[in-house]
């Protein structure tokens, strides 16, 4: 007897949210675990009036034999609109003008029921933050609880059985998503930073919320209610919690960055003549190479620690390169899309055909300058330190990145050092609260309109504003869709249901652009629903994006390869 199924769900592969019963019929245990996990993480720290917290958005859970990866979107709150009966808000003028105008600083929604908490949302303000959680039970002796036994101030309740047991025991092999194309994910994420410095608790949010952007609300209430989002032009923050304790090592990449990016030696622009500029640049490169190697090889006892330090430094340099330019020249993350953002270590950063030529030029320049500036003996002495650790490639990648930044006359944007320090404080806060090592990285999304999930969540914020109609929202999205048509997107269909614009009778409005066939089995379609609570009730949003076979278009949420 043939099984009846939803045609859309058959085409969605992993994205089966439209037909959950079909999935649970075959994977009942996995569905139970997934719902249990999502309920647990959603109850850990909900936002309240006096404490910051987070709400879970779209959630994707991947099970592997010895670990489980949880990827979910955390919607950010855009800049507040003006209050009724109040003067209009002060225009934000932060110290981060050099970072470019990407968008307002966002924060998470609070569960408070006041009018201020339900302020309407403006179009481009709604962003996304991608959070990934890794649960690993490889080492039983290192298994720990996510939260300490002391529950003061966490604000979660005991509705999930996972709280009472070690997570590793409840996350054993389910095999729900076991597929050959996911086999590389473990290797891609194996580089994760496992070291962290212990800091004392400090005021974390002053940097993320300047005084001018706090309107006239009490500062303490705003800071306690919100979780900091990423500064402008660093659109997204990736957090990874490693739920197994590791030995920590002390390495400060901020010091290294300050040394080789800041003008330690005389800048070429301050010297007269080409020869003087060349000598100044040579001295600076030589000084930076020696300083970098000394910092990354001192107090080393094993290869693993050396690799951690260099990898940590490379990530910070990537962050700097990201912040210093509005147009990136290399791919910083292999998973192109809005769901997975895991930059690999030095090798993964340069696995881009577009960057191969530049990479070879830098390597050649590195060899010439090292031999000519520092002398054969000095170069060999530095290289031997890494040869002893059997990892000369790490040295090459680190120095190569330094030369790239120096030769392009990069400057640290004003306030960037402050940003790095605040990121470290944020990691420290999370480390102290969860007793787990935490990784925070800043990445960007190149094309949001290739995936249905970010569009659906972005639209779900906008109907809160009574003045925004469905037509205006749809027309704004349609303007950007042609930009991704060349990448394989054929069309988009959007439907909104509910009391739109406060109408007394609920209705459904739909719009489409391009080809969006939902009745063809072999059509590649990405689908995502979303809900939004307004003062007039709950409204729903559905988004379909169709992809071309000839251009090999594909949904971002289903992309796991470079």
UniProtKB/Swiss-Prot annotation:
Q: What is this protein called?
A: Small ribosomal subunit protein uS3m
Which superkingdom heads the taxonomic lineage of this protein's source? Eukaryota
Q: Name one GO biological process term.
A: translation
Entry keyword annotation includes Zinc: no
Gene Ontology molecular function terms on file: RNA binding; structural constituent of ribosome
Keywords, ordered alphabetically: Mitochondrion, Ribonucleoprotein, Ribosomal protein
Pfam families in UniProt: Ribosomal_S3_C (PF00189)
Q: Could you tell me which Gene3D superfamilies the record lists for this protein?
A: Ribosomal protein S3, C-terminal domain
What family does this chain come from, according to its entry?
Answer: Belongs to the universal ribosomal protein uS3 family.
Q: Which PROSITE patterns match?
A: RIBOSOMAL_S3
Tell me the compartments it is located in.
Answer: Mitochondrion
Question: What does the entry list under GO cellular component?
Answer: mitochondrion; ribonucleoprotein complex; ribosome
